[in-house]
Design a protein with these regions (language model features):
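Extracellular beta-strand-rich solenoid/capping regions of secreted or surface-exposed proteins
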Residues: 51, 65-78, 88-150
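Acidic, glycine- and Ser/Thr-rich low-complexity intrinsically disordered tracts
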Residues: 327-329, 334-441
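C-terminal motif of bacterial Sec signal peptides marking the signal peptidase cleavage site
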Residues: 15-18
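Short glycine/acidic-rich loop motifs that flank beta-strands on beta-rich extracellular proteins
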Residues: 66-72, 91-98, 117-123, 166-173, ...
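Bacterial signal peptide processing site
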Residues: 20-22
């Protein structure tokens, strides 16, 4: 149902004046639940359509370049492009955020977002627009008040292409119950996908491709129900990081699962510089607790394949690295954390630091380190020494290739409720090669 602008404007005007005449009821009847609002046919800008939308509506966006920042504040609104590659939000390296969704159940799908100073797509419970302008949190910002800004409930990003943004491509911060899937992120000055400051998160990151970012996927102070499954993370400076820090609330991070991913060749020079100087790292756990890294293919990273470290004030503990294929990295496995409950088993490494790591800190039948009760601390392992080269400005990273679009963008839309649904990491086997993932959902 496409509703014309004049009808909707009349409905809004009547609501604003508090009119209770039969005309008001008639206008409501012409805006039934699930209305499709079309841009540019019915509205000149996306924000105009979003402002008129009600819960359960879809804003369907036709091909074009939209130079605007969009705020989605109402619940259960779906923002969808008719063509993933031809519907483009462009910040012109001038606007701060592309699409910011604070409404519960928001969906952003089948479109491209590029050249914003901060984030391409932001899902957050932080409703203060001044804080949103600063990125709404993240590694460069102070902790935010989770009582004042409770997590937004329900979000989804599907088939989103985001590139050349100054912080994050797709950013879920202070958000719960979501899915980020089948998306492509490149050229971000920080990370392609970032999940931060949530407990429980109940967030699924699956089937995405991360390339030519400073960091591919970043999980910070995000705990309970974080699943990173079946993604391709290649050609970044750093592949995947799982962190605890004091620059956001809800530390320490706990209980993420990384399974069935390919993390390869994360030492690309044609990328933005990583803020901490990281380069050539496949998977890095910095102060994470109770995380599981299993059945991932981790190869070709010049510094290290998988490393566990203790950042100041946040000792890593209870992390399990099992059943991966970690090969052809500067150092395949590195344990630089003191707690004996971290363990490594069955990862097929050629190199380990400290030497014999899997024998000294193997995982027992219950997943805990087989030597946790009596082994004591091991010598701290070290990654191979790598000098990070100079990077390129985020706005100058080449655009990614065209990506698969929705088969039928006119299909009925579904808000982001009841997510992520059943999540089964065991359904994601060890990839046989770098072409094995991602698989569309």
């Amino acid at each position: 149902v496409a509703v014309r602008l004049s009808v909707l404007v009349a409905a809004v005007a009547l609501a604003a004046t508090g009119c209770s005449s039969p005309g008001s009821a008639s206008a409501d009847a012409k805006h039934p639940a699930g209305t499709v609002l079309r841009v540019p046919q019915d509205f000149h800008t996306v924000q105009q359509a979003v402002d008129v939308a009600r819960s359960g509506d879809t804003v369907l966006i036709g091909p074009g370049v939209y130079r605007e920042s969009v705020q989605v504040t109402k619940p259960d609104v779906v923002l969808r492009g008719t063509d993933r590659n031809a519907v483009v939000f462009d910040g012109g390296v001038r606007l701060v955020n592309g699409i910011t969704a604070t409404g519960a159940g928001s969906v952003v799908e089948n479109l491209t977002v590029r050249d914003y100073l901060a984030n391409g797509v932001l899902f957050t419970g932080v409703t203060d627009q001044k804080l949103q302008q600063r990125g709404a949190g993240g590694s460069a910002y102070d902790p935010l008040d989770t009582s004042r800004f409770p997590a937004v409930q329900g979000f989804r990003a599907t088939r989103v292409t985001t590139y050349d943004n100054g912080l994050y491509g797709i950013y879920a911060f202070d958000a719960h119950g979501g899915v980020i899937e089948d998306s492509y992120a490149s050229g971000q000055a920080d990370s392609g996908i970032y999940v931060g400051q949530c407990r429980p998160c109940d967030t699924l990151v699956r089937g995405n491709t991360m390339a030519h970012n400073a960091v591919g996927i970043e999980i910070t102070n995000a705990s309970e129900g974080v699943s990173v499954l079946g993604n391709l993370v290649t050609g970044n400076r750093v592949g995947v990081t799982v962190n605890s820090n004091d620059q956001e609330a809800l530390a320490p991070q706990h209980g993420a699962v990384l399974a069935g991913n390919v993390i390869s060749d994360d030492n690309a020079t044609d990328t933005p510089e990583q803020a901490d100087g990281g380069f050539g790292i496949g998977i890095g756990i910095g102060g994470g607790t109770g995380d599981r890294v299993q059945r991932n293919l981790v190869q070709g990273n010049t510094a290290v394949g998988v490393i566990i470290t203790d950042p100041p004030g946040h000792p890593a503990s209870g992390d399990q690295v099992t059943g991966n294929r970690v090969t052809g990295n500067g150092e395949d496995l590195v344990l630089a954390a003191a707690d004996p409950s971290n363990c490594f088993s069955g990862n097929q490494p050629a190199t380990q630091s400290p030497a014999g790591l899997e024998g000294l800190a193997g995982c027992g039948a219950n997943g805990a380190s087989s030597g946790a009760s009596g082994r004591g601390s091991l010598p701290s392992g070290r990654a191979a020494s790598v000098q990070a080269p100079s990077g390129v400005p985020f706005s100058q990273v080449p655009a990614p290739p065209a990506q698969p679009s929705m088969p039928d963008p006119t299909a009925a839309a579904v808000p982001a409720t009841g997510l992520p649904g059943t999540v089964d990491p065991d359904a994601y086997p060890l990839p046989t090669d770098s072409g094995a993932v991602p698989a569309a959902h």
